[in-house]
């Protein structure tokens, strides 16, 4: 079946929904979501959203400098300036949509400070800021008459000239996006969504790794689709591992112990109770995430331990419960009282700094296709993301994409000659074990060889293993009736390959990419 919309939005986190709300007054919007609107990475963001609001002590230049330092000086300066300077107006847009940020008794924002920030500038809603934003946007989206929500729909491929029989290569200068083939997971039908403009907002790819704080839907779908359509993908080697995910084997996703807990005064300790951050960085537990994650990884490998501890037992118990109610309840459910007991933590794949390369308008290298949020690479994060810069990047670039696409979408027409999905000659896959086992294998390969610390030999081994899985999976895809599980396996193999290949191409240790065989560049 063919469905036509002015705007096709693939993904329903803060990026996809804020874009949808900004364009919906001017045209019909399809919001495609592979599970439900609640199941986005945004929902899991605890810490907050960074913006200069207290101008008595803070200013844009400080936020810009902090971002450049965190990014190891390879962030795109224009992107950094754009996000920092436009942040306050986008915070207001969120408030207008119903987001309730915590305030102090004077009615001013109650600001947190997190690792890498020189000032208190993190707006938050207790310790579940992402959930507050997601729920507010869901309400606004559901109310809008021009937005049609397609939940349990999974985008398989974006449509380009390739689907009209034209040969498209990475050198083709004018690739255009005409929409997407989308699988209705409940009926197993593939629909052709034709659009004037498409926005990719599919989030990150934490599910490529064995341990991740991301929801299980974070399989890098948008990045894989755009790469297969010959779009440009950049900086995939920069994977941020959150240093402190709650250590609870079998939890997937891993429960996040927010950065704000270290900003609050939490101390990292080894299993025998000794502090260790003084060996690694003068900022101790408040050092940037990559330094803390490598320090914890090193302590664990050196000692043969499977976790370290985060200690807030020296803080006022009532204050701890007030600041971190969710963390307190979660730990208590596991028999850990954080006001008296140390919290067991270990690093987990958390955030992708790279993705679909976009310009200042959030436009990708494929015409009529924009990308916003974690699936995009704006250049803001460079080699490493500054804490709480991602939610604000998503709304700033969603705004840019909305303005640019609204200025141009009426110039475009639907490509009615795109053929419908053809699955002749395919059969139902009777062997789901092939897919589930291969997915586990990808996660094991990535965690072992392309994790926090890398070497040339590990990366080469990952290449060889992924190459074999790629060949087998492509063969299975051609023969089988399409399914969400098979598409996700294909996507994590594509994304794993991109992370590994771009890691091999970077002949230095920089930001989050740490290769023992290539010492840190002094440049």
Protein language model regions, located:
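Short beta-strand to alpha-helix junction loop
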Residues: 75-88, 121-139, 150, 212-220, ...
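Conserved redox-cofactor binding core of oxidoreductases
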Residues: 96-189, 194, 201, 245-248
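An anion/pyrophosphate-binding glycine-rich loop and adjacent beta-alpha core
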Residues: 37, 225, 231-338, 343, ...
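Rossmann-like flavin
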Residues: 70-110
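Glycine- and aromatic-enriched mobile tails/lids
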Residues: 1-6, 22, 36-38, 44-45, ...
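FAD-site-proximal beta/loop scaffold in flavoenzymes
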Residues: 157-169, 173-174, 178-187, 336-380
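N-terminal Rossmann-like FAD-binding beta1-loop-alpha1 element of flavoenzymes
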Residues: 7-31
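Conserved N-terminal glycine-rich FAD pyrophosphate-binding loop of Rossmann-like flavoproteins
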Residues: 35-68, 72, 240, 251-255
């Amino acid at each position: 079946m063919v469905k036509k919309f002015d705007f096709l939005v693939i993904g329903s986190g803060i990026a996809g929904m804020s874009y949808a709300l900004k364009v919906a007054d001017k045209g019909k919007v399809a919001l495609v979501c592979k599970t439900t609107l609640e199941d986005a990475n945004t929902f899991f963001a605890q810490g907050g959203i960074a913006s200069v609001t207290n101008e008595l002590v803070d200013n844009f230049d400080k936020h810009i400098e902090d971002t450049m330092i965190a990014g190891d000086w390879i962030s795109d300066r224009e992107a950094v300036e754009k996000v920092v300077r436009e942040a306050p107006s986008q915070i207001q847009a969120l408030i207008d949509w119903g987001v309730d940020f915590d305030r102090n008794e004077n009615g001013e924002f109650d600001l947190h400070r997190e690792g890498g920030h020189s000032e208190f500038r993190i707006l938050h809603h207790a310790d579940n800021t992402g959930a507050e934003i997601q729920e507010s946007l869901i309400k606004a989206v559901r109310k809008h008459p021009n937005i049609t929500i397609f939940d349990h729909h999974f985008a398989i491929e974006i449509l380009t000239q390739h689907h009209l029989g034209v040969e498209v290569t990475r050198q083709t200068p004018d690739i255009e996006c005409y929409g997407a083939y989308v699988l209705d997971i409940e009926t197993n039908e593939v629909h052709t969504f034709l659009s004037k403009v498409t926005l990719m907002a599919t989030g990150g790819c934490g599910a490529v790794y064995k341990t991740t704080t991301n929801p299980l839907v974070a399989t890098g779908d948008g990045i894989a689709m755009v790469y297969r359509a010959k779009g440009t993908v950049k900086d995939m080697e920069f994977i941020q591992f959150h240093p402190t995910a709650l250590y609870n084997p079998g939890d997937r996703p891993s429960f996040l112990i927010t950065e704000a807990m270290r900003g609050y005064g939490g101390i990292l300790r080894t299993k025998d109770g000794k502090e260790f951050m003084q060996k690694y960085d003068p900022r101790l537990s408040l050092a940037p995430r990559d330094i803390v994650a490598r320090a914890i990884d090193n302590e664990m490998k050196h000692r043969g331990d499977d976790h370290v501890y985060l200690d807030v037992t020296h803080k006022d118990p009532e204050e701890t419960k007030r600041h971190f109610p969710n963390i307190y309840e979660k730990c208590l459910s596991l028999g850990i009282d954080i006001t008296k007991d140390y919290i067991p933590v270990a690093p987990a794949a958390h955030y992708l700094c790279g993705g679909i390369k976009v310009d200042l308008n959030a436009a990708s290298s494929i015409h009529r296709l924009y990308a916003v949020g974690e699936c995009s690479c704006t250049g803001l994060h460079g080699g490493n993301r500054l804490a709480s810069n991602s939610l604000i990047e998503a709304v700033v670039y969603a705004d840019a994409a909305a303005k640019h696409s609204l200025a141009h979408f009426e110039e475009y027409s639907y490509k009615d000659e795109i053929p419908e999905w053809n699955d002749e000659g395919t059969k139902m896959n009777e062997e789901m074990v092939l897919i589930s086992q291969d997915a586990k294998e990808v996660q094991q390969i990535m965690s072992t060889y392309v994790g926090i610390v890398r070497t040339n030999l590990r990366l080469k081994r990952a290449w060889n293993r992924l190459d074999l899985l790629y060949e087998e999976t492509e063969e299975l895809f051609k023969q089988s009736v399409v399914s969400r599980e098979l598409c996700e396996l294909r996507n994590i193999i594509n994304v794993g390959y991109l992370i590994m290949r771009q890691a091999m191409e970077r002949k230095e240790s920089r930001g989050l990419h740490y290769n023992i065989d290539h010492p840190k560049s002094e440049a």
